[in-house]
Amino acid sequence: MRLPDLRPWTSLLLVDAALLWLLQGPLGTLLPQGLPGLWLEGTLRLGGLWGLLKLRGLLGFVGTLLLPLCLATPLTVSLRALVAGASRAPPARVASAPWSWLLVGYGAAGLSWSLWAVLSPPGAQEKEQDQVNNKVLMWRLLKLSRPDLPLLVAAFFFLVLAVLGETLIPHYSGRVIDILGGDFDPHAFASAIFFMCLFSFGSSLSAGCRGGCFTYTMSRINLRIREQLFSSLLRQDLGFFQETKTGELNSRLSSDTTLMSNWLPLNANVLLRSLVKVVGLYGFMLSISPRLTLLSLLHMPFTIAAEKVYNTRHQEVLREIQDAVARAGQVVREAVGGLQTVRSFGAEEHEVCRYKEALEQCRQLYWRRDLERALYLLVRRVLHLGVQMLMLSCGLQQMQDGELTQGSLLSFMIYQESVGSYVQTLVYIYGDMLSNVGAAEKVFSYMDRQPNLPSPGTLAPTTLQGVVKFQDVSFAYPNRPDRPVLKGLTFTLRPGEVTALVGPNGSGKSTVAALLQNLYQPTGGQVLLDEKPISQYEHCYLHSQVVSVGQEPVLFSGSVRNNIAYGLQSCEDDKVMAAAQAAHADDFIQEMEHGIYTDVGEKGSQLAAGQKQRLAIARALVRDPRVLILDEATSALDVQCEQALQDWNSRGDRTVLVIAHRLQTVQRAHQILVLQEGKLQKLAQL
């Protein structure tokens, strides 16, 4: 049997004993007397234990024990001062207290630590590890929002003004009550009403400006994240897009980026507003009555503990309800889907009983959920009413002693009603921020992903012959590395010649075209262009010299001109029309209402299939490439358009690779390559 690790507890006792010895000696004489000295002693003790245990790497075991251990005594003595009067509260020091007091302190702290551990939900250690990872994501989001810092500062400024106005309204409400309850002063009454209206209008205006700044910040962050993510996606290798579903990428670009952009402004708004509200409200409450202010904090630990217990049980019952509803749905699907079998065996009543039992389980779980909710609300309400009764009792005593007025007590009660929700927000906001930042993890993983591509090439010669050589080229797709598509291909494509690549479906013809465009990297061998590896050429230069027309051309929403000149930095209209004429696309373009500026619709939806094919060929010809790849593109062309393409080929010494099925295209080729199962089967010179 493995013994538990006692090092954290031994270290805690030794370090605490050393700190108490220091606080009992010369260091303790420097501390003030009374409650301030007691709180300062507890703070120094907490800081010392925290720092020394963290230095030794033992904080994670006993970290939650330190807070009740060090601050239980100051809190207890402070509460005694509130109930019995400050003059009779014992100004004790933990360092000079008897050992029995220390044992009681350790026992109470250990009991609270054990209770907290029992109430912790299962998987707390894994959750802590997730929060560590989320902290890294949180800091990355903050850095990503750095350009919007001026807007956030402006939003914080308006936030402070809005909160200040909201906080001052109850103050002047109390002034109005005091004026109406005493000797009526018209000038003082008018002044109080004026300031109430002024601060109401000012807080509303400031709140609107605050919301505008945060909303504008969200839109800027959203655009920045989407731009960076889209830029990163376009740089990825094609293997990434084969492994990742398009719907998932759309989800990251739309919903996840929106969640990321909303994270900082919304959480900063809630956090800063709650923080300023708590500071402002407690400032006013302390100015009215310090004793009532401390009493208002009495129910906070109990409320937080009750909420922790409720949330743990609530999450558990929600999971059980989800499972029970799924089981009930499964009964319905099985019965309806196999209705013929149910009737053939006369099992209708049996299925009804099964469904009734499943519904009964759901009903019991719903009842348990509602009962626990009611008990939780009852506990919160009883705690809240108990503290309010205690405060009203103390407030009445202070009014009788002349320390408070009716208006001051009313203002204090208004402040106390709203401050509790802001304190709870501050307690839970950090955990919520860490939990909600998880949407950024996948987005950042895409942005950080390095494409499986060689280093960018730099070759961009002024002249290019267009000699293409495949030297013992083999290839397998990244998602299927054990299934090679090409196996040791060796052939040459020469300028001025048309090479026909034929073979059955799945033989690797389109893969040859993809390798020639440097869309994939061979797993073996080399693809050479003018005796240089094709990966050494500069990206834009290569794709201006090696151009492909696919079997199913892809057009983009926009004008005819934009689609033909797609990817070119500058292209004159005359050059666009010349390419369209060479592809026999000028006839239908001239018949359009706006000519080359006519919108083709999404994916070219306004065009026929043959028209799309001609625009795709014009898009290739406008670049005047040295190497042209026709991936079964001629199959959608008529004879006249195909003849125009042959005329374009005959006007220069270009290298043309045609992936074809038509006999007419093969007969006009200078060279025929036959692929079958990734191997070159036949090489015929015509």
Swiss-Prot record:
The keyword Endoplasmic reticulum applies. It holds the Pfam family ABC_membrane. The chain crosses the membrane at residues 7-27, 57-77, 99-119, 149-169, 188-208, 267-287, 294-314, 375-395, 409-429. It is found in: Endoplasmic reticulum membrane. Changing D16K: Complete loss of interaction with TAPBP, resulting in impaired PLC assembly and antigen presentation. Keywords: Adaptive immunity, ATP-binding, Endoplasmic reticulum, Host-virus interaction, Immunity, Magnesium, Membrane, Metal-binding, Nucleotide-binding, Peptide transport, Protein transport, Translocase, Transmembrane, Transmembrane helix, Transport. One of its GO terms (molecular function) is tapasin binding. PROSITE patterns: ABC_TM1F, ABC_TRANSPORTER_1, ABC_TRANSPORTER_2. Gene3D superfamilies: ABC transporter type 1, transmembrane domain (1.20.1560.10), P-loop containing nucleotide triphosphate hydrolases (3.40.50.300). Residues 1-6, 78-98, 170-187, 288-293, 396-408 are lumenal. Its EC number is 7.4.2.14. It catalyses: a peptide antigen(in) + ATP + H2O = a peptide antigen(out) + ADP + phosphate + H(+). SMART domains: AAA. Residues 28-56, 120-148, 209-266, 315-374, 430-686 are cytoplasmic. Residues 468-686 form the ABC transporter domain. It is a multi-pass membrane protein. It comes from the Eukaryota. The peptide-binding site is shared between the cytoplasmic loops of TAP1 and TAP2. ABC transporter associated with antigen processing. In complex with TAP1 mediates unidirectional translocation of peptide antigens from cytosol to endoplasmic reticulum (ER) for loading onto MHC class I (MHCI) molecules. Uses the chemical energy of ATP to export peptides against the concentration gradient. During the transport cycle alternates between 'inward-facing' state with peptide binding site facing the cytosol to 'outward-facing' state with peptide binding site facing the ER lumen. Belongs to the ABC transporter superfamily. ABCB family. MHC peptide exporter (TC 3.A.1.209) subfamily. This is Antigen peptide transporter 2. The gene is TAP2.
